[in-house]
UniProtKB/Swiss-Prot annotation:
Name by which UniProt lists this protein: Fumarate hydratase class II 2
Keyword Ligase: no
Residues the UniProt record annotates as site (Important for catalytic activity): E325
Protein's organism: Pseudomonas aeruginosa (strain ATCC 15692 / DSM 22644 / CIP 104116 / JCM 14847 / LMG 12228 / 1C / PRS 101 / PAO1)
Function: Involved in the TCA cycle. Catalyzes the stereospecific interconversion of fumarate to L-malate.
Record: active site: H182, S312
Induction annotation: Part of the fumC-PA4469-sodA operon which is repressed by iron (at protein level).
GO molecular function, a single term: fumarate hydratase activity
Gene that encodes the chain: fumC2
InterPro entries according to UniProt: Fum_hydII, Fumarase/histidase_N, Fumarase_C_C, Fumarate_lyase_CS, Fumarate_lyase_fam, Fumarate_lyase_N, L-Aspartase-like
Residues reported to bind substrate: 98-100, 123-126, 133-135, 181, 313, 318-320
Compartments where found: Cytoplasm
Enzyme nomenclature, EC number: 4.2.1.2
Amino acid sequence: MTDTRIERDSMGELAVPATALYGAQTQRAVNNFPVSGQRMPQAFVRALLLAKAAAARANVSLQQLDAPMGEAIADTCLQLLQEDFMQHFPVDVFQTGSGTSSNMNANEVVATLASRRLGGKVNPNDHVNCGQSSNDIIPSTIHISAALEISERLLPALRHLEQTIQSKAGEVHAYVKTGRTHLMDAMPVRMSQVLGGWAQQVRQAGVHIESVLPALQQLAQGGTAVGTGINAHPRFAERFSQELNDLTGLAFRPGDDFFALIGSQDTAVAASGQLKTLAVTLMKLANDLRWMNSGPLAGLGEIELEALQPGSSIMPGKVNPVIPEATAMVAAQVIGNDAAIAVAGQSGNFELNVMLPLVADNLLHSIQLLANVSRLLADKAIASFKVNQGKLSEALARNPILVTALNPIIGYQKAAEIAKQAYREGRPIIDVALENTDLDRARLEVLLDPEKLTAGGL
């Protein structure tokens, strides 16, 4: 038995692995693009198969395919989704800019299996690709995959992170710590106020990400090659969206303008921008956690993160803040992905963007990373850290910035003199204020009470 078989396409004959479900066009792409060894994302291929199933059903309803053939195509797509389908999709991310290679990969695999199911010939171009062009199915698949991943993975992960932060805020409400601006001592804050700020950042990032879903749910499908809809039934776009909604439970619809959706990737650029904002938020949270956990002896030591693994191959007993570090690296990667997507978004020449696979890969990579690390940050860092009350109290007692509360009574200049003396002499602020003002200790204890100062006001 030979290891290959001969397949044919419009360019001629080509040897293909004997057991491969794909055909000549996929094999040409494999031969042409041995670039990264990185295949198109699983979420993208999943969405592409859903789109092919929706297209087949739409074409049956519009009498563009006979029912047995259309059903064979749709059923094949859905069956593939229940299996290890990625083994049949070997095309590299760095391929033709339209993603035609990935489209034909899907068409050929589905045609092979649908032919077996039907007991007759199913053609990759004429049947599986009926009413479609790579130029509308690939932009549509980018939107479909991103919308699904955001809805099913990222937004639930962000809700979990926010809820975990809120729960921890309630747990640590009684603790008051030294606030810091410019990494320098400032007025006191409650730990719950710090975490409340984090929760709001995460919540707002989620709102902004969710706000791009209506745009992602507008599809280029039906515009075919250049946006005019050539070779697609006039009602194909509408029927396609209806069938896709039945399969996904989302609210996809034909785009307001096919020319814009095929010629540009503005929606993906906008979505990536919101993902970058979330990355910036998570970087801030990670850095706050690392600083508060620093030490344990020579740093701030305000909290103790859960010890998850040894931190050094040479220094025994060292434990590092590995989850915040992983979070910070994810944030850096997402910011880099956003830059790549922005460059790719500029690469729309006339009627087609020609960096579609790059957009898909980076956008879905960012969503995946952010969803996964948000859950890790919640479960393995925020939920389990412990507060070091001794460190908090020690720092508060020696914080001359508490004198700020005396500004309305003794004035800024006098307060500054007291703060500087307390710094210089290493004495508690209340003792220095007692010597340099007419206020008695009882009054100063009320005015300089860190807990009361966290409530603001005069």
